[in-house]
A protein has these predicted regions:
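Short beta-strand/loop element within the Bergerat-fold HATPase_c
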Residues: 98-110
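Short conserved segment of the HATPase_c
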Residues: 123-137
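Short alpha-helical segment of the dimerization/phosphotransfer core of two-component systems
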Residues: 12-17
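Acidic ATP/Mg2+-coordinating residue in the GHKL
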Residues: 118
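Short helix-loop "hinge" at the ATP-lid/N-box region of the Bergerat-fold HATPase_c
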Residues: 90-92
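Conserved glycine-rich
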Residues: 164-165
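Conserved micro-motifs of the catalytic ATP-binding
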Residues: 31-36, 68, 72-78
């Protein structure tokens, strides 16, 4: 039994390190690469991210829903989908037993605004100023157990900046968190 537990621990740590390596690589690539922002249907990106994240909610009593405006904005769709999935994953980790996650996409004059809101634990104001720092984790013991390395929000911040935007955080301890990804890549009327 001890050997089985040790093997499972080694396997889970190996997966965590692999995930960490991939996120570090993503950060390095983002800093060096030029991206072309293409007309993308906001609905397609949000539905894709929600569909990808839904299976990870199976072990918890979490409702995950998406709402969006109909239309196109300029973005790198794979990166924005990754941003949304990372924000959903963080929201899921903030919910202990049951709760709700809502992903909302709105078209703006400059591009789009993607909001991910959860009914999780929330954060203290002093934690909000550091959460996009690479390797920073609000709850180190919990995120280690859940596979977090503290790179997801740093990656999201880079993606937002590539879209001439930013991340905005609002949180109330014990009530939940809202993350707004302001993406100012531009708007378009056609595919």
């Amino acid at each position: 039994e001890e050997q089985q537990e040790a093997a499972e621990y080694i396997f889970s740590e190996g997966r965590r390190l692999e995930s960490l390596s991939l996120k570090l690589l993503d950060l390095l690539v983002l800093k060096k690469k030029d991206f072309e922002l293409r007309p993308t249907n906001l609905q397609t990106v949000i539905e894709g991210a929600v569909h990808t994240a839904l299976p990870s909610m199976a072990d918890k009593n979490i409702s995950l829903k998406g709402r969006y405006d109909d239309g196109f904005c300029l973005m790198e769709s794979d990166l924005v989908k990754s941003l949304i999935i990372n924000l959903i994953d963080n929201a899921k980790k903030a919910i202990d037993d049951s709760g709700n996650i809502l992903v909302v996409g709105r078209l703006t004059e400059e591009g789009c605004l993607i909001t991910v809101a959860d009914t999780g634990r929330g954060m203290k104001p002093e934690e909000l100023s550091r959460i996009t720092e690479a390797f920073y984790r609000v709850d180190k013991s919990r995120s280690r157990a859940q596979g977090g390395a503290g790179l997801g929000l740093a990656l999201c911040q880079e993606i937002a900046e590539l879209h001439h935007g930013q991340l905005i955080f609002e949180s109330i301890l014990g009530k939940g968190t809202v993350v707004k990804a302001v993406l100012n890549g531009g708007r378009t009327k056609c595919e």
